[in-house]
Regions:
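Structural recognition of the beta-propeller blade-terminating site
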Residues: 35-36, 75-78, 128, 169, ...
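Blade-level signature of beta-propeller repeat domains, shared across WD40, Kelch, NHL, RCC1
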Residues: 232-281
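Beta-propeller domains
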Residues: 23-46
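Beta-rich, blade/repeat-based domains predominating
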Residues: 6-19, 47-67, 89-112, 121-123, ...
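Short, solvent-exposed loop/turn segments at conserved positions within beta-propeller repeat blades
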Residues: 27-28, 68-69, 112-122, 160-163, ...
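Loop/turn-rich, solvent-exposed surfaces of beta-rich toroidal or solenoidal domains
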Residues: 168, 176, 181-216
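Beta-strand initiation motifs
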Residues: 1, 39-43, 79-84, 127-134, ...
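A short loop-to-beta-strand structural motif that recurs across blades of beta-propeller domains
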Residues: 31-33, 71-74, 122-125, 164-166, ...
Length: 281
């Protein structure tokens, strides 16, 4: 059974499980939230940007935040202050973020809502623990959520406009190679479970919003129906946490955003599941 944990978000994104609580970005409110099992929310950071922004953590526990329109990767210090971890503005706007078990931060971007015919402007950047930056993937059709396997050997990224989950091998130096289709399904903010399947918001074959558990190759293993569009999900404490909002696919981006800023419909939903989370984030 699916239950409502919290209502009143603008657009919840970047679902994470960290230190025994559910965390997310509350787009439109400039907030990073942590929410406990009773639905009590705490603002953990305020991000001076619009949208998008995404979150993850370095191995030492410091929070990283992508400030998308500004092209910055921010880091939260012990004082709570957000400082620049890496200036990536020369590459363009940023979207999603994942940090692997070695402290490598992968940041994607180039998410053009109206690319030219045949254009795939998306990219993935690697920010290593020593601060160096390099571009490790190109030609992505609106890169979105990413996951990395527990052994740090494979990265999977959702190409929302390409309608596929795309996988890469990860080398010891963090480079990506051997691009391939992991599953022929679109995705958004996603997570991996201990069986190697991926949970992601998506759509049923009949076009209804749902959170899907997908096996490598594309088989749908489980489906959790959703009333509104799903944006991201994660696993924690035996529970699938899902972020939804009343986004209308037939309306322009600005129309949706204006409506949701006026009447927030964002929710955190929960659904019990037996297979625990694995990998990163």
């Amino acid at each position: 059974m699916t239950e409502v944990l919290l209502e009143g978000l603008v657009i919840g994104e970047s679902a994470r499980w960290h230190d025994g609580r559910f965390w997310c970005a509350n787009w439109g409110a400039q907030e990073v939230l942590a929410v406990d099992a009773s639905g009590k929310r705490e603002v953990m950071a305020r991000v001076p940007t619009t949208i998008p922004f995404s979150i993850d953590w370095l191995p030492d526990g410091r929070l990283l935040v992508t400030s998308g329109p500004e092209g910055l990767l921010l880091r939260q210090e012990s004082s709570g202050e957000l400082v620049t971890h890496a200036d990536l503005s020369s590459y363009g706007g940023l979207n999603e973020l994942v940090v692997d078990g070695r402290g490598n931060a992968y940041v994607n971007g180039g998410c053009d809502f109206q690319p030219g015919p045949g254009e795939r402007p998306g990219f993935i950047l690697l920010v290593t623990p020593d601060g160096s930056v390099r571009r490790v993937a190109d030609e992505l059709a609106f890169p979105n959520g990413m996951v990395i396997t527990p052994d740090n050997s494979t990265l999977v990224v959702a190409e929302s406009f390409g309608g596929v989950l795309t996988a890469y091998d990860v080398a010891d130096d963090g480079s990506l190679s051997n691009r391939r289709v992991w599953a022929p399904h679109p995705g958004d903010g996603m997570c991996m479970d201990a069986s190697g399947a991926i949970w992601t918001p998506g759509w049923t074959p009949s076009g209804e919003s749902a959170c899907l558990r997908i096996a490598e190759g594309g088989d749908i293993l489980d489906t959790v129906p959703l009333e509104h569009a799903g944006f991201a999900c994660t696993l924690g404490n035996g529970t699938l946490h899902m972020l939804t909002a009343d986004w209308h696919l037939d309306e322009p981006f600005d129309t949706n955003l204006d409506r949701l800023l006026t009447t927030p419909t964002g929710r955190i939903l929960t659904h019990r599941t037996s297979t625990p989370k694995a990998g990163y984030p």
